């Protein structure tokens, strides 16, 4: 590979990374603004806002951006958008269920972008309720291992309402009912255990195993959906084995 083409490739990769980082920052800022609007601008009395701010800080969002978003949401500063949360349902290739959560100030634009991403990548939209029943809303706390064992984490969160602790390789995932999320996060803090994020999420109650080709198609569809600024979260019930993930990483 020549020096020029190598530089062009590196430059392209950096542009992709920067674009994704910009989208991630925008989503984190939206989270803060919406949380402040719904529950008030004081993070001490608004756990959802507290968690949104913590997640933004851990993702290196500048403090000034965080504070301006909080103020816009709380009505202390003009300029906040009228964000709406809209959930769409559909299917990826191989019958994999997909839940798409949009946070948008333009419902028609969001619907159009979701539909285009789905149809161009082998997916199909589904009627409301036809996919959602395959998922349960849960509180999810993720934390780096940092020398901790699964038993260490379980001992800290069991009495706070945690349902299970999952080993994700480099990190742990604590699952609880959404109403117990603050208690679980607080229990970790009281035990001196730092966490990466604490938020409500959808966990599949029924999983759909996919092979390497199926996983490629599902991830391609998810990437296309997440390219939309209006798409906030995408959940699927695809069950991707460690072997398939390793094969994808090697491509």
UniProtKB/Swiss-Prot annotation:
InterPro entries in UniProt: Integrase-like_N, TACO1_YebC-like_2nd/3rd_dom, TACO1_YebC_N, Transcrip_reg_TACO1-like, Transcrip_reg_TACO1-like_dom3, YebC-like
SUPFAM superfamilies named in the record: YebC-like
GO process annotations (BP): regulation of DNA-templated transcription
GO molecular function terms noted in the UniProt entry: DNA binding
Keyword hit for Transcription regulation: yes
Keywords, comma-separated and alphabetical: Cytoplasm, DNA-binding, Transcription, Transcription regulation
Cellular location(s): Cytoplasm
A Pfam entry, by short name: Transcrip_reg
GO CC terms, sorted: cytosol
Family per record: Belongs to the TACO1 family.
Name of the protein this chain belongs to: Probable transcriptional regulatory protein ML0475
Native species: Mycobacterium leprae (strain TN)
């Amino acid at each position: 590979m020549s020096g020029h083409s190598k530089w062009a490739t590196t430059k392209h990769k950096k542009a992709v990374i920067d674009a994704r980082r910009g989208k991630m920052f925008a989503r984190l800022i939206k989270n803060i603004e919406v949380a402040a609007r719904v529950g008030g601008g004081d993070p001490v009395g608004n756990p959802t806002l507290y968690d949104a701010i913590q997640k933004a800080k851990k993702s290196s969002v500048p403090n000034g951006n965080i504070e301006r978003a909080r103020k816009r949401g709380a009505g202390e500063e003009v300029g906040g958008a009228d964000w709406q949360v809209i959930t769409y349902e559909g299917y990826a290739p191989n019958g994999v269920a997909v839940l798409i959560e949009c946070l948008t100030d333009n419902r028609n634009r969001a619907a159009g972008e979701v539909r285009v991403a789905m149809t161009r990548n082998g997916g199909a939209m589904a009627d409301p309720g036809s996919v959602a029943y395959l998922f349960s809303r849960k509180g999810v706390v993720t934390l780096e291992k940092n020398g901790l064992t699964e038993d260490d984490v379980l001992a800290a969160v069991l009495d706070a309402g945690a349902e299970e602790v999952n080993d994700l390789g480099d990190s742990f995932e604590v699952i609880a009912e959404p109403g117990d999320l603050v208690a679980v996060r607080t229990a970790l803090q009281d035990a001196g255990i730092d966490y990466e994020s604490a938020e409500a999420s959808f966990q599949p109650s029924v999983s759909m195993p996919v092979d390497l080709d199926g996983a490629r198609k599902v991830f391609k569809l998810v990437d296309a959906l997440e390219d939309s600024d209006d798409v906030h979260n995408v959940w699927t019930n695809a069950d991707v084995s460690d072997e398939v993930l390793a094969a994808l990483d090697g491509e």
